[in-house]
A protein has these predicted regions:
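Cytochrome P450 heme-binding "Cys pocket" and the immediately downstream C-terminal segment
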Residues: 297, 419-457
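Cytochrome P450
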Residues: 25-33, 81, 104, 108-149, ...
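Conserved cytochrome P450 K-helix/beta-meander segment immediately N-terminal to the heme-binding cysteine loop
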Residues: 369-397
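Central I-helix of cytochrome P450 enzymes
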Residues: 253-310, 337, 368, 418, ...
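Cytochrome P450 heme-thiolate monooxygenase catalytic core
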Residues: 139-283
Length: 470
């Protein structure tokens, strides 16, 4: 390219950047009643670099600097955060915000479910899951799940040393999948699970980035996503061929396929698998880690378990739903772990201009609420950074109540439909493994990673444990 050509290109590039900046500046000026805005020198990128380094810490720093409501411009999106409890009802109940619009793009990027397909089936799928996994039907899962957990724990032997997160993952995954999908439907046995496990863990670990970025920037993650989608074509076919006539004998996957009626079945099935693993397994890890690390809590838990199942840890027990009701302190521990390691953010899309306090939030903004920080409100949770299961004695646990200020399962029309099943499976697994084995921590309990906004917080480092049969 000659000198004239280089100068022409430079001038063109400069004018383009200048025009983009003017458009960005003008956009900000059109909203004089908008909340304080954190952006950057480059219009599309905005605060992405600062936000991405440690998003959880960034949110709290921004709240301290800007106040209760503020907007972050990042990666071409406007993220408006509400951080005070008096504004949360607007987040959950306003007709000017929409959950489905907020998550549709992420569903497309992670599972290739089109807007049309999502709009057609999402509400029906949610309502089916909510009913099938509701409190009145949990007894249908208990016996089989208890047996599956027993079988998985047999592989641990009588003693060993392992990273606690890996131990939980390998002990829970196949049991829950066999329970919800049907035995032999998904790869779960040790001869076939290795390749699947590699792809699924890569898909899970990259899910947050995959929900936001083009696949061309995440080639390894994209490869695993499409490998899993291809696998689920055969999973769906197998489940359809094995479908029983009796409605109560069908697995949750088979009920999902009935609801979808041919609409993106492999794609929704992959999301169902991810949803069944992505939050319950980390929370089980945190629950066990917090219990084992506190001598008083550990002793109290063991006293409670032995009062229900006697003191013979080697005895095989089948846990029923009525047994779980006799373990309230264990449930307190689970709820406290969920509180401490709640999702970084949940979101709604503003579809009509929204007034919060004296601010006007324009349509198109993503309205954000950080459950992680909401659960550190000292009004509801004194000493919020401490693991204090006793605080949950105030909640009516036997009536499935939660403490005021606790919002881990969301709110409004689309709360987590599998929340009661998740609490049951975590409580059952924790009861079985603590009853069967005595644990010793070899590492301190790790901090949570500050990088995750989607889903339960992940551990920042390893947590090695030693275990032996009781």
């Amino acid at each position: 390219m000659d000198v004239v050509g280089c100068i022409s290109l430079l001038v063109h590039t400069s004018l383009t950047l200048a025009a983009a900046f003017l458009v960005y500046w003008a956009f900000k000026q059109r909203h004089p009643a908008a909340p304080p805005c954190i952006g950057g020198c480059i219009p599309w990128i905005g605060a992405s670099l600062r936000f991405g380094k440690a998003p959880l810490e960034f949110i709290e720093q921004a709240r301290q600097e800007c106040g209760a409501i503020f907007t972050v411009v990042a990666a071409g999106k406007r993220l408006t955060f509400v951080t005070e409890e008096e504004d949360f009802e607007i987040f959950f109940k306003s007709k000017n915000v929409d959950f489905q619009e907020a998550v549709q793009e992420a569903v497309w990027r992670t599972a290739s479910i089109s807007r049309k397909s999502f709009s057609k089936s999402h509400t029906a799928v949610h309502d089916m899951m909510k009913w099938r996994l509701g409190p009145s039907r949990l007894h249908l899962f208990c016996s089989n799940l208890s047996e599956e957990f027993h079988e998985c724990l047999m592989h641990l032997g009588t003693k060993g040393t392992d990273d606690l997160y890996n131990l939980v993952w390998h002990s829970m995954y196949s049991a829950v999948v066999n329970n919800l999908f049907g035995r032999g439907i998904c790869p779960t046995d040790r001869n076939t699970v290795k390749e699947f496990e590699e792809h699924f863990q890569k898909f899970d670990s990259g899910f947050e980035f995959g929900s936001q970025l083009p696949e061309c920037l995440l080639r390894g993650w994209s490869k695993s996503k499409h490998w899993l989608l291809s696998l689920f074509e055969s999973v769906v076919a197998k489940a359809e061929n094995m479908k029983p006539a009796d409605d109560d004998s069908k697995t949750l996957l088979q009920h999902l396929l009935d609801t979808l009626d041919g609409n993106s079945t492999a794609n929704y099935s992959l999301l169902m698998l991810w949803a069944s693993q992505a939050n319950a397994l980390p929370i089980t890890f945190w629950t066990l880690a917090f219990i084992i690390s506190s001598p008083f809590v550990y002793k109290t838990i063991m006293k409670e378990l032995c009062s229900v199942f006697d003191d013979q840890g080697s005895k095989k027990v089948e846990i029923k739903e009525t047994d779980l009701e006799k373990l309230p302190y264990l449930k307190c521990c689970i709820l406290e772990a969920i509180r401490l390691r709640a999702p970084g953010v949940i979101t709604r899309k503003v579809v009509e201009p929204l007034t919060i306090r004296n601010y006007i939030i324009p349509s198109g903004d993503m309205l954000m609420l950080s459950l992680y920080w909401a659960h550190r409100n000292t009004k509801y949770f004194p000493e919020p950074e401490k693991f204090l299961p006793e605080r949950w004695k105030e909640a009516v646990i036997e009536k499935r109540g939660f403490l005021d200020g606790f919002m881990a399962f969301g709110g409004g029309r689309y709360q987590c439909p599998g929340r009661w099943f998740a609490l049951m499976e975590i409580q059952m697994f924790a009861a079985l493994i603590l009853y069967k084995y005595e644990f010793t921590l070899l590492d301190p309990v790790p901090k949570e990673s500050p990088l995750h906004l989607v889903g339960t917080q992940q551990p920042l480092g390893p947590c090695k444990v030693e275990y032996k049969s009781r």
